[in-house]
């Protein structure tokens, strides 16, 4: 029997079993359960086990798995049942934003709380936001550092904006705070995060993606009229400004992460052309080595909000947004190489454009992203 095997051999075998299969073993053997909770083992498992890549989508304030069938014409999207989590009234919790980090989801809710959630294990951790949270436009990101035992210590970055329209000219503030899971459960102001003045009060930062523990965000400098890539290092707790690829016509942009690759999509409002660049080189100080993906496609879909999922192997882009018009629709787009497919799939009822105001109290945009189940515990 496997339970009689030496522990090191059991560990070697189980470290190569997918996470969704391993979670069912937690209740079968006390010895295995202890191993699966070992943080050293979960780190080893994350790097050695097959990646069960899935596509998740935030729609109607809940998280849904979706599957895409490219073997039919036109391609189709199938929405599965919403993911559930350990909460007495989970169906009543309204999720307004989601940030993914190696199998953990950082969700913002409408009751001034954050929840860190591992859907694979069903574990959650609720975090109360500050009482004055609603005074700001806020962006949250989840990341981690590796401690001396090569185990992860998680942190949450809070980026906020404040506006004072009573002053002349109107004043705009920008601040950063951090929440450490290993601390006394309080928010800490970051005074030196912007050490090299990579951003200022004229910078607009968008919600980003997580890669290797750090957060990558798109940013826009109002004074310079330029876009750039911003990286927050959770170890040094500082921002770093990075270069984007050279686009012929800088337009609307989105970021995506899959299999330790960062993708940036650029969509031209002038030509309606879409192009994608990818990189997996993160060792340079400021200049990333970008590679252009040959996915030439035209899309007449002016966007208000959007998010991106890119599959390089299948040369397919999925993204969701609100289509422009007098009455706006929430739509999933499937776009293939050389206009191989182009399809719009509405996924909620039409809503009036007046409700699509960019304010932090109303969130109507949805998210689509790559998700890989993991055994990381929320500590």
UniProtKB/Swiss-Prot annotation:
<dbReference type="InterPro" id="IPR017451">
    <property type="entry name" value="F-box-assoc_interact_dom"/>
</dbReference>
<protein>
    <recommendedName>
        <fullName>Probable F-box protein At3g22720</fullName>
    </recommendedName>
</protein>
<dbReference type="InterPro" id="IPR036047">
    <property type="entry name" value="F-box-like_dom_sf"/>
</dbReference>
<dbReference type="InterPro" id="IPR001810">
    <property type="entry name" value="F-box_dom"/>
</dbReference>
<dbReference type="InterPro" id="IPR050796">
    <property type="entry name" value="SCF_F-box_component"/>
</dbReference>
<dbReference type="InterPro" id="IPR006527">
    <property type="entry name" value="F-box-assoc_dom_typ1"/>
</dbReference>
<dbReference type="Pfam" id="PF07734">
    <property type="entry name" value="FBA_1"/>
</dbReference>
<feature type="domain" description="F-box">
    <location>
        <begin position="1"/>
        <end position="49"/>
    </location>
</feature>
<dbReference type="Pfam" id="PF00646">
    <property type="entry name" value="F-box"/>
</dbReference>
